C-alpha cells in the first residue's frame, strides 16, 4: 500500500506492483503533496486511473465524509486526525486540546520548499510563514526555524506554541476527546444513516 497525492503517482505505484493506493487529499494533516489537490477532486481521478483498490484520505472524520468518499469510488477510508485526537492516542493532552479548540481555517499548509506540511497556526507557524513570505528563505533556514524534532515537541511533548502541530482540516469537526471505540461507532452509524437517507430519495 502506498500513499499518493496525485493520479500520476498512483499510476506509477500501480505499475510498481502495489496492492492498494491511499489517495490523500490536500486537507490531510502533516505532509502533503505539492499538487494541493483536494480529496473531492483527487479520489475520482485516482479511481479512474488505477485498477487496484483506492483508499480515500484527507479531511475524513465523519460518517458523511466516509460515505462521500465511497460514492466517489473509494473502497475504504484512512482516518488520521479523528483517531490522533482519541483518548488512547499517544499525543499529548495539550496537543489534543489545542486541536479541538480550533475551527475552520485554523490549519495552514506551509514548508512548501521542504515538504508541504499542514500545521495548526501557532508561534512556530508564524515564524515559518514570515520567513516564507520574505520570498528568499532557503531550505536550510527553514530547517533552522523548525529546530530538531519539531513534531515531537508539539505533538508528544505538548509545546503548543513552539512545536509542530500536525493535524488535518477535519479536526475542526471534532469538539471533544472520545475513545477510539466511540469514534468508530459514531462514524459507522452516521455513514449508515446517511446511506439510508440517500436511498430514500425519489428520482424524477
Regions found by a protein language model. Name each.
Residues 33-55, 61-204:
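Conserved active-site-proximal phosphate/metal-binding subdomains
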Residues 1-3, 174:
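Active-site mouth loops of central-metabolism enzymes
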Residues 3-44, 86, 90-91:
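Glycine/Thr-rich beta-alpha phosphate-binding loop at enzyme active sites
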Amino acid at each position: 500500500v502506498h500513499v499518493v497525492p496525485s493520479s500520476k503517482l498512483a499510476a506509477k505505484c500501480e505499475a510498481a506492483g502495489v496492492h492498494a493506493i491511499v489517495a490523500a487529499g490536500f486537507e490531510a494533516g502533516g505532509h502533503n503533496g505539492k499538487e494541493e489537490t483536494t480529496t473531492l477532486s483527487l479520489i475520482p481521478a485516482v479511481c479512474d486511473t488505477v485498477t487496484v483498490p483506492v483508499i480515500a484520505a484527507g479531511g475524513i472524520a465523519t460518517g458523511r465524509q466516509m460515505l462521500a468518499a465511497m460514492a466517489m469510488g473509494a473502497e475504504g477510508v484512512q482516518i488520521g486526525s479523528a483517531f490522533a485526537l482519541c483518548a488512547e492516542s499517544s499525543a499529548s493532552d495539550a496537543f489534543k486540546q489545542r486541536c479541538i479548540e480550533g475551527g475552520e481555517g485554523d490549519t495552514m499548509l506551509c514548508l512548501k520548499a521542504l515538504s508541504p506540511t499542514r500545521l495548526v497556526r501557532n508561534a512556530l507557524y508564524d515564524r515559518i510563514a514570515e520567513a516564507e513570505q520574505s520570498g528568499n528563505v532557503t531550505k536550510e533556514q527553514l530547517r533552522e526555524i523548525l529546530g530538531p524534532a519539531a513534531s515531537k515537541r508539539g505533538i508528544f511533548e505538548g509545546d503548543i506554541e513552539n512545536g509542530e502541530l500536525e493535524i488535518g482540516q477535519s479536526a475542526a469537526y471534532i469538539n471533544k476527546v472520545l475513545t477510539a471505540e466511540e469514534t468508530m461507532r459514531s462514524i459507522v452509524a452516521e455513514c449508515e444513516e446517511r446511506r439510508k437517507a440517500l436511498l430514500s430519495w425519489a428520482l424524477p
